[in-house]
């Protein structure tokens, strides 16, 4: 394992920073940080409130697009800083596409004259809250504007229809070309952006996946890290879905452009509420791991079992040279008649220490530190740390010392023995420990969601680099927390 993983846990404390303002005064479902900007989108009631991570206060609101509660929101990645795109998923069985053009910094002459040390990005976010003069649509009359509601900087541009019941979750692929939505109707839909330009907003359904046997609670795309391209018989995009049927499914697009289920992850004894991919690239080139949390009170870590022999065999098939390459398929280079089975083996390599005594609703994996956070129905926040297994580390060190005096023919045997010693919970010779926990994070209320995000507030030592936790609860309050170690 990389040296970044410490040999043992250290003490830590979860300390409140302050709640985002204003309070939402009704159940809030989830808060999603923008991938690059200091913005946080919180789904609640029939709207989405966008908070500034700089001021920890409201930046703008998206209202009028849905007839029932908004359950989820996702930012589209890859856009310039002055343009925003967000998808909201609602209990009204639709997903809505919203756009915001933030060229308002130029429209606010005061923004350029402020004596302030904020970055241009910070000035732009601040200025955008002042300049609310742009109409949502130049062709709308006053009645249409009042019906749309919310801040006039946001334009509700498209409704995605097709689900038969509540949309539980939505997520963009890392490229932004695909959008996944899931629903109480037991299906996962994949939509593709087919517009000629970003402003076209033309999306078509490319897959409807119906293999789950219960409500689909969550979808998550594998992050864009080098290791995700290792499986050459598929495209680079990998989607995971979690369900009321107690399973997680892994989906990939095959060489014929069909989305197929390549693995079913079984082990939970209750609804799988949430999933999240490992965010940090693994130094050893390992495929990203996956976290899942469940109504059974557990958090599990899943890992793809790499088949190196199979990968090497694939590389050797399909002919050599330009003629051979031309005759191969674009994905993997294996003719249909020679392709291996579209299946992957995933194993549960860890069940994190039991702390929660009720449903675990949400988990989050820090990209910066590798810490895992969880929360749920019991109102607790729990932090976990992955550590080198002490017995494995000791044996490896002992073997290294012994091997210095052994003949070369015996060194490989000794090394093989050392690397095969792993903890019961992990194939990587690591264990998971509870770093700290906090009870009653939102008082007597359930906590529905937790996420890591970067800090931009004035109290941060390194704005844009430091991390904090954000929790969202039934009390309608979005809270920020610092992890002190």
Can you annotate each of these PLM segments?
Residues 31-37, 74-83, 164, 170-177, ...:
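Loop/turn segments within WD40 beta-propeller blades
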Residues 21-28, 63-70, 113-118, 153, ...:
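WD40/WD-repeat beta-propeller blade N-cap
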Residues 100-147, 192-200, 252-257, 303-342, ...:
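Short loop/turn segments immediately following beta-strands, especially the blade-tip
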Residues 20-46:
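Beta-strand-rich domains and repeat architectures in extracellular enzymes and scaffolds
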Residues 451, 462-485:
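Blade-level signature of beta-propeller repeat domains, shared across WD40, Kelch, NHL, RCC1
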Residues 48-52, 95-99, 188-193, 219, ...:
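WD40-repeat beta-propellers
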Residues 2-26, 55-57, 149-157, 343-349, ...:
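A short helix->beta-strand "capping" segment at the edge of beta-propeller domains
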Residues 43-45, 88-92, 175, 181-185, ...:
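Conserved strand-to-loop turn within each blade of WD40 beta-propeller repeats
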């Amino acid at each position: 394992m990389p040296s970044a993983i410490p040999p043992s846990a250290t003490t830590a404390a979860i300390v409140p920073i302050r709640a985002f303002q204003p309070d939402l005064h009704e159940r809030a479902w989830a808060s999603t940080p923008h991938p690059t900007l200091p913005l946080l989108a919180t789904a609640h009631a029939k709207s989405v409130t966008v908070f500034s991570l700089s001021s920890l206060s409201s930046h703008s609101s998206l209202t009028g697009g849905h007839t029932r509660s908004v359950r989820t929101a996702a930012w589209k990645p890859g856009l310039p800083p002055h343009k925003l795109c967000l998808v909201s998923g609602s209990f009204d069985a639709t997903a809505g596409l919203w756009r915001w053009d933030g060229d308002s910094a130029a429209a606010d002459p005061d923004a350029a004259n402020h004596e302030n040390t904020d970055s241009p990005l910070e000035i732009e976010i601040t200025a955008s809250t002042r300049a609310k003069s742009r109409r949502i649509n130049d062709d709308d009359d006053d009645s249409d504007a009042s019906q749309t509601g919310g801040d006039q900087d946001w334009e509700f541009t498209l409704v995605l229809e097709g689900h038969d019941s509540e949309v539980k979750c939505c997520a963009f692929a890392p490229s932004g070309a695909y959008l996944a939505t899931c629903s109480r109707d037991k299906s996962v839909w994949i939509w593709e952006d087919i517009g000629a330009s970003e402003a076209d907003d033309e999306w078509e359904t490319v897959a409807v996946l119906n293999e789950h046997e219960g409500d689909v609670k969550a979808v998550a795309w594998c992050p864009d890290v080098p290791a995700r391209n290792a499986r050459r018989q598929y495209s680079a995009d990998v989607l995971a879905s979690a369900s009321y049927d107690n399973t997680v499914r892994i989906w990939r697009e095959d060489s014929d452009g069909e989305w197929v289920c390549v693995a079913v992850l079984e082990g939970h004894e209750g609804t799988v509420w949430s999933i999240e991919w490992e965010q940090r690239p693994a130094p050893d080139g390992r495929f990203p791991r996956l976290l899942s949390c469940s109504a059974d009170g557990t958090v599990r870590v899943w890992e793809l079992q790499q088949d190196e022999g199979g990968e090497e065999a694939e590389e050797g098939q399909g002919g050599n040279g330009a003629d051979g390459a031309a005759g191969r398929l674009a994905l993997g280079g294996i003719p249909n008649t020679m392709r291996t089975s579209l299946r992957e083996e995933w194993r549960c390599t860890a069940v994190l220490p039991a702390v929660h005594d009720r449903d675990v609703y949400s988990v989050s994996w820090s990209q910066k530190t590798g810490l895992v956070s969880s929360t749920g129905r019991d109102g607790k926040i729990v932090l976990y740390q992955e550590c080198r297994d002490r017995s494995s580390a000791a044996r490896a060190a002992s073997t290294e010392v012994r091997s210095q005096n052994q003949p070369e023919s015996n060194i490989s045997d000794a090394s093989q023995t050392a690397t095969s010693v792993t903890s019961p919970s992990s194939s990587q010779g690591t264990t998971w420990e509870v770093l700290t926990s906090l009870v009653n994070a939102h008082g007597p209320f359930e906590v529905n969601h937790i996420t890591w995000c970067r800090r931009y507030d004035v109290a941060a030592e390194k704005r844009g680099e430091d991390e904090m936790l954000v929790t969202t609860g039934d009390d309608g309050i979005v809270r920020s927390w610092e992890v002190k170690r």
